[in-house]
Amino acid sequence: MQHLEEIIASASTAIEAAESLVALDEVRVQYLGKKGELTAQLQSLGKLPPEERREAGQEINKAKGVVQQAIAARKDALQSAELEAKLAAETIDVTLPGRRIENGGLHPVTRTVERIEKFFGELGFNTEAGPEIEDAFHNFDALNIAADHPARTDHDTFFFNPDLMLRTHTSGVQIRTMENGKPPFRFIAPGRVYRNDYDQTHTPMFHQVEGMLVDENVNFAQLKGILHDFLCNFFEEEVEVRFRPSYFPFTEPSAEVDVKGKNGKWLEVLGCGMVHPNVLRSVGIDPEKYSGFAFGMGVERLTMLRYGVNDLRAFFENDLRFLKQFK
């Protein structure tokens, strides 16, 4: 027992004297390692009489516990001192710029849709939506599109079967909205549409915004005034607008709308016209009592003109170098 107390005292002194983790580990090996002093005491138990081994073993294990606790406490103290010394030695350069958190931005097409919705919303137009998989009635028949019209061929339209297709315009939303309500109507219908075309100015999927106003005594002059104000608002300057006679199955009379660019050339931006009486009849509205106008615009087309982009496909290639310009 006396010998164990001496070992504990010696170990405690060595532990307190250790000035580094390396020195402390050397003390651990000296007393607790395979050839350590306390390990040797355990190995010598076999030499004792059987009646003394149990008590002696308990005392040796108790001594090991005391030494282990002392080593653990000293290790914590040395680690804390080492950390404090490291922190004291290090300096923080407060002039170093922080890491910039990069903000995202809206896609230019989304920006354009929101701008259109805001303008027409201030004029009292609601925003309506409809399915992108459309049936022939809502996509063609109700819009006065003849059975032999080229748009009904698979050269222009993505068909699932003869009666179901990816919608080629958001005009079907106009039909559904009128089917489910009663005049007057005043709404726009933004959304994705699909046509079988792909080049510098066309993609198989693009965005359209169509609008409609149906009420008593609606006339073409009102349509012209609204679209002129819209285009000036959209381009944020007074623009020269031209209405050219055109043909659409669902409007009569019909017109295409151009704006004069800075180079003096006319650029087509949208189509419009007075709602054809057959369209009103297809949804149960009396064309003798009600009239209306409709218009439609390609969102990407307007976005290209507003931001000076000359290739429509850039909007869908997800090139961050391109998209970051619109933050």
Curated annotation (Swiss-Prot):
Its EC number is 6.1.1.20. PROSITE patterns: AA_TRNA_LIGASE_II. GO terms for biological process: phenylalanyl-tRNA aminoacylation. GO terms for cellular component: cytoplasm. Its cofactor is Mg(2+). Gene3D superfamilies: Bira Bifunctional Protein, Domain 2. It catalyses: tRNA(Phe) + L-phenylalanine + ATP = L-phenylalanyl-tRNA(Phe) + AMP + diphosphate + H(+). SUPFAM superfamilies: Class II aaRS and biotin synthetases (SSF55681), tRNA-binding arm (SSF46589). It is found in: Cytoplasm. Its main location: cytoplasm. This is Phenylalanine--tRNA ligase alpha subunit. The lineage of its organism: Bacteria, Pseudomonadati, Pseudomonadota, Gammaproteobacteria, Vibrionales.
